[in-house]
UniProtKB/Swiss-Prot annotation:
Ca(2+) 1 binds at D30, D36, D105, D107. It comes from Caenorhabditis elegans. One of its GO terms (cellular component) is plasma membrane. It is a peripheral membrane protein. Residues 582-592 have a biased composition (Basic and acidic residues). Expressed in head and tail neurons, ventral cord moto-neurons, body wall muscles and hypodermal cells of the vulva. The gene is nra-1. Disruption phenotype: Sperm directional motility defects. RNAi-mediated knockdown causes a moderate resistance to nicotine-induced paralysis and a decrease in unc-38 synaptic expression along nerve cords without affecting lev-1 cellular expression levels in muscles. CDD domains: C2A_Copine, C2B_Copine, vWA_copine_like. This is Nicotinic receptor-associated protein 1.
Length: 634
């Protein structure tokens, strides 16, 4: 979880992105011929990963915070080069991957690490998320000391020229899909039929095996038909058609109510019915006619000898290779991530002016709420071209109001939940903090239901997907209603991230993050897992009592809370049968409002405080927002 920055954890979802680069109207610095351009790409691997607002004084090739990721060939005598060499980079949705593209006029066909003898032509700095969001990104090159700027409609060429970056997934995830059933399986239960399921295992060269896929359990049958199976061929057999694949058939033994362990432990006492070995090529022969595979139980075979035939038969049919749309397919097709945030203003946070309060505003260090907000927003902003967010507060009394608001717009100045950019969210938060009375209780259901109503309007296509971030310091007061709301929203284009701040015991909150089993209440079961919960305190220090740098905290926190989002989005789209729009005909991308400043928004600097709302100002009313007053609990 707290791995070194820039080192990829093999367990995290990763996609390789291939970048192709061209440039136009470059400066001509040669006297008797045109420039001979070469493009180098760098990634910032240490220090703060935010776009700089100051002039760059140290050449990137000398700056130890930047690591070269590759370089193109030199294109001789050309001001409009189309470089043939491409860059292959790992892409992580949950990370800020800050890149620099720098073009030099090479003074020789061979360019070494020292670039001091080569003329600088231009630079563009951006995060990888910007590139993959547009698929094709064009930008003005910046002069020496500048970082350039993204090309806008109606822009004209500048003296430094422009760069165009094309991004595409290097390789699509290939899966084998097939139907499978069993016939005549051995009976393992004394008083009833077996409860069979299948394990598909990869076999490695050293003979060891690893579980790749498990089917559902089919109760009380010796002739089961399981749901259609889909398995990644790279994971199953490294796409090797002749590599052995192990299939195991087990009879599941039920546990007594309240005794069933979590995770794979609940399969620990199951009885083996039989095993078989096959290959990808053999499975694919089931594309036309059914493939029959005999299950063998070695213990039973040794006991019965020649009388033993098999322990049942597996039949596989409708086999085919499928390539499913990926997260980047949807993003490149214009799918936008709408983002909403809800901040806990209950009294248990402590008086904001007290240094022990979780809302305390220090002059030199952001509080935990600010860290959580910036951590998630700094990633998600690149997937919403409008640069606007919805921001709410909950559990406070607003100015001139007697009742407690279970949900209110964070921007008290304008009385609206819509704010522009990260700066707008942070400014609205600080302003609200100085104008509301912290109260209680901690109710999540009104927030979830409000955002779910918005997500309900997104169900007709793949254009938008909603993410809700809730930051809280305590135990939920309306757990039953919250679970009901989450289950009701589980079929919507919605992911919910909950970050617990402070030192409260959040054990019950883990019930909402149903990684082992889908969330259930009475007879209702969630359609999918849409909640990710983490506690902030796990990220604040290095394990030796020393607080980490805020930038490191934000990076590690974002990595943990956001990595499930791509799978949740693609899982929803698959469930609804939605396909991504073509890259050359994407969903419409809204432009940010005129007041949005991308440079200021990326710095993290504190914006000026908003003024208090005028006397008699009426705040908007949301459904079911007023709750019974409870005394503050500091």
């Amino acid at each position: 979880m707290n791995q070194p920055i820039g080192i990829a954890d093999s367990s995290r979802p990763k996609t390789n992105v291939r970048l192709t680069i061209s440039a136009n109207n470059l400066m001509d610095l040669d006297v008797f011929s045109k420039s001979d351009p070469i493009c180098l790409i760098y990634e910032k691997t240490s220090g703060r990963k935010a776009t700089t607002t100051e002039e760059i004084t140290v050449p990137t090739w000398k700056d130890k915070q930047w690591t070269e990721r590759g370089r193109t060939e030199v294109v001789m005598n050309n001001l409009n080069p189309q470089f043939t060499k491409t860059f292959l980079l790992p892409y992580f949705f949950e990370e800020t991957q800050l890149l620099r593209f720098e073009i030099y006029d090479a003074d020789s066909p061979t360019v070494g690490q020292d670039l001091s003898s080569h003329d600088f032509l231009g630079r563009f700095e951006c995060v990888l998320a910007q590139i993959v969001s547009y698929s094709t990104l064009k930008a003005h090159l910046g002069k020496t000391g500048q970082i350039g700027a993204q090309w806008r409609n109606k822009d004209k060429n500048t003296k430094t020229g422009s760069i165009t970056i094309y991004a595409e997934e290097d390789e699509k995830a290939e899966k084998i899909q097939f139907d499978v059933c069993g016939e005549g399986l051995d009976k393992k239960d004394f008083f009833g039929k077996s409860d069979p399921y299948l394990n598909f295992k990869r076999k490695f060269d050293d003979g060891s095996t690893h579980l790749i896929h498990r089917t559902e359990v089919k109760p009380k049958t010796l002739d089961p038909r399981w749901a259609t199976v889909q398995i990644n061929t790279q994971t199953l057999c490294a796409k090797d058609g002749d590599r052995p694949i192990i299939i195991e058939c087990y009879d599941h033994d039920k546990w007594k109510k309240g005794e069933e362990p979590r995770g794979d432990a609940k399969f620990s006492r199951d009885d083996l019915i039989g095993t078989a070995q096959t290959t990808l090529n053999e499975l694919l022969r089931g594309s036309s006619d059914a493939v029959e595979i005999l299950l063998t139980n070695e213990k039973k075979k040794a006991k019965k000898g020649d009388k033993y035939k098999c322990s049942g038969t597996l039949k596989i049919w409708n086999s085919r290779i499928v390539i499913e749309p990926t997260f980047l397919d949807f993003i490149s097709g214009g799918t936008q991530l709408d983002f909403a945030v809800a901040v806990d203003f209950t009294a248990s946070n402590g008086p904001p002016k007290s240094s022990s309060s979780l809302h305390f505003m220090s002059a030199d260090r952001p509080n935990q709420y600010e860290l959580a907000l910036r951590s998630v927003l700094s990633i998600c902003q690149h997937y919403n071209s409008s640069k606007t967010f919805e921001a709410f507060g909950f559990g406070a009394k607003l100015p001139n109001q007697s009742s407690v608001s279970a949900i209110f717009p964070l921007d008290l100045q304008r009385g609206t939940s819509e704010v522009v950019g990260i700066t707008g969210v942070m400014t609205a938060y600080r302003h609200a903090l100085s104008n509301v009375q912290l109260y209680g209780p901690t109710n999540f259901a009104p927030i979830i239901e409000n955002v779910a109503r918005k997500a309900q309007n997104m169900i007709h296509d793949s254009a938008r997907y909603q993410i809700l971030l809730i930051i809280t310091d305590g135990i939920i007061s309306d757990m039953h209603a919250t679970i009901r709301s989450i289950i009701s929203a589980s079929g919507l284009p919605l992911s919910i991230i909950i970050i617990g701040v402070g030192n409260e015991d959040f054990e019950k909150m883990h019930e909402l993050d149903s990684d082992d089993a889908l969330l259930q209440q009475d007879s209702r079961i969630a359609q999918r897992d849409i909640v990710q919960f983490v506690t902030m305190r796990e990220f604040l220090n290095n394990g030796q009592g020393l607080y980490l740098d805020p930038d490191v905290i934000q990076e590690n926190l974002a990595r943990e809370v956001l990595y499930e989002v791509p799978a949740q989005l693609t899982g929803y789209m698959k469930q609804r049968g939605f396909q991504p729009r073509p890259v050359d005909d994407p969903w419409r991308r809204d432009s940010p409002p005129p007041e949005f400043d991308p440079i200021l928004d990326g710095t993290g600097r504190r914006a000026p405080m908003l003024q208090a709302p005028p006397a008699g100002f009426q705040y908007p009313v949301y459904a079911d927002t007023s709750i019974a007053s409870a005394p503050p609990m500091y």
